[in-house]
Regions:
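Hydrophobic helical membrane-anchoring modules
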Residues: 2-3, 12-31, 169-171, 194-276
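Acceptor/aglycone-binding surface of glycosyltransferases and processive sugar-polymer synthases
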Residues: 88-103, 121-199, 226-243
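Short beta-strand/loop segment that forms part of the nucleotide-sugar
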Residues: 38, 51, 59-68, 86
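Conserved donor nucleotide-binding strand/loop of the catalytic core
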Residues: 59-62, 73-103
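Short aromatic/hydrophobic "clamp" motif used to bind/position activated sugar donors
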Residues: 109
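Cell-envelope/extracellular polymer assembly enzymes that use nucleotide-activated donors
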Residues: 33-35, 60, 204
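A conserved acidic beta->alpha catalytic loop
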Residues: 65-73, 116
Length: 276
């Protein structure tokens, strides 16, 4: 069975029936509410799979719609009537994420792409890391247990180089920089500034949580191929954009870092979008 068929049916990637829920360990029985933010533009064909893999104990799903014309919003509401839809007013993934973060009410926020490349059932691992003491749970395709079906040799090399630069410049220990499947405590929204509207916002977050002295834990994650549609990623162009973000950030020496009470993400003034 091909991925196209899998994307259209409520079944797993290998053809097996997905469980009605993902068992949670006993220490997660009192997990705080979890919000999942999904930026989407013309992802109607992929949403059935994305929504189906989300654990049933998720408190809230926030779909940030980038003016889709293929019925993305209608599909989302049909699949999950309680979905919170935010109409993105600006452009870019960073703008979409900032709009989504502002609309979240959960104590934990998870970032998930709408193309079906991320397995929603991995969210339990992210939440477990946060409940166990991490401030920021960073997905990694190259940590032990992770993997990817969607990375060319040039992208892999570029990611490795950019990751090495960030680790050297900011004292991080990342194994995967350019991967946006992350989760964090909502109180983090009070402490760092996100002033990037493009996809580079993910790199900016990765750098600034380290600069702030937050506890970061990598989570092994498997990236799958996009189910439907074509990715607009361009290895060289996008790599240069990420490099610019890295170079403009000022590193803070380890000796002067202190662990803050919280991490702030200051949302720019003015309306980010309309929730419905």
């Amino acid at each position: 069975m091909g991925r196209q068929d899998i994307g259209r049916q409520d079944i797993g990637r290998q053809g097996q029936e997905l469980p009605a829920y993902r068992p949670i360990s006993s220490h997660l029985a009192i997990t705080p509410p979890v919000s999942v933010v999904i930026p989407a533009m013309n992802e109607a064909q992929n949403l059935p799979y994305v929504f189906r893999t989300l654990p049933e104990w998720i408190h809230e799903v926030v779909l940030v719609d980038g003016d889709s014309t293929d019925g993305t919003v209608e599909v989302a509401r049909a699949l999950r009537p309680d979905v919170k839809v935010v109409a993105q007013r600006g452009k870019g993934k960073g703008d979409a994420l900032i709009s989504g973060f502002a609309a979240c009410t959960g104590d934990i926020i998870v970032m998930v792409d709408a193309d079906g490349s991320a397995d929603g059932q991995e969210i339990v691992s992210y939440v477990s890391a946060l409940v166990s003491g991490a401030d920021f749970a960073k997905g990694s395709r190259f940590a032990n247990g992770g993997g990817t079906d969607d990375m060319t040799a040039i992208r892999k090399l570029g990611n490795r180089v950019l990751c090495a630069v960030v680790n050297a410049k900011f004292g991080a220990r990342y194994t995967d920089l350019c991967y946006g499947y992350n989760a964090f405590w909502r109180h983090c929204l009070d402490e760092i500034t996100l002033d990037c509207t493009g996809f580079e916002v993910e790199t900016l977050m990765n750098i600034r949580v380290v600069k702030a002295g937050l506890k970061v834990q990598e989570i092994p994650s498997h990236e799958y191929d996009r189910i439907h549609g074509v990715s607009n990623l361009r290895a060289v162009r996008d790599g240069l954009r990420v490099l610019k973000v890295i170079l403009r950030e000022r590193g803070v020496p380890r000796s002067t870092r202190r662990r803050p009470v919280a991490l702030r993400i200051s949302v720019p003034a003015g309306p980010r979008g309309e929730a419905s």
